[in-house]
Amino acid sequence: MQTKFNYVKPSECNIDYHNLINYAKRLENQDIPMHSLIIMRGNNICMESYYKPYDNNSLHRMFSMTKSLVSLGIGCLYGEHKLSLDDHIVDYFKDKLPQNGAYDYMKMLTIRDMLTMRTCHDSTTYKTAGITDWVGSFFTVKPVHAPGTQFSYDTSSTH
């Protein structure tokens, strides 16, 4: 499936051109190493710029993209009122819970906790030897603290 994007003036996206220019200048003034900047609304591209030595054909290695994409998807579902950030994550993954039921801390874990990396684990769960089900490991590895109380960079929470 390929989506066609339209190139339009920022005003056609209800965006002030001067705000886009000021934003781009602010990034540059703060020495943020930009490769590209694309501003879209719907299927419309309102601004597209590239920073030397990069151009629209430059390839990039991508790391930790799952977190961004999952967060975007959750935001869309939240905007459509299909879920709440305070929903308990175990309600969405009943088939991944241990046979004897979820741990108490796991039952308390919310989508909000997951998005903010304040889960009940203090490390990535699927890196334990012998684990092949990354999603399942999140629910079967014993939690170490109450959710929402500690930040821990945890890749398994987004998988």
Task: Indicate residue ranges for each PLM-predicted region.
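Short, compositionally biased leader-like segments
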Residues: 1-16
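A short, well-structured edge-of-sheet supersecondary motif
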Residues: 19-55
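A generic structural signal for nonpolar/aromatic side chains embedded in well-ordered alpha-helices
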Residues: 24-27, 114-115, 138
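Extracellular/periplasmic catalytic domains that process cell-envelope and extracellular macromolecules
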Residues: 30-31, 105-109, 144-145
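Active-site SXXK
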Residues: 43, 61-86, 114
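Catalytic-site signature segments of enzymes, centered on catalytic residues
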Residues: 56-57, 102, 121-159
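Short alpha-helical patches at coil-to-helix transitions and adjacent helical residues
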Residues: 65-71, 108, 153-159
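Active-site helix/loop module of the DD-peptidase/beta-lactamase fold
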Residues: 80-121, 140
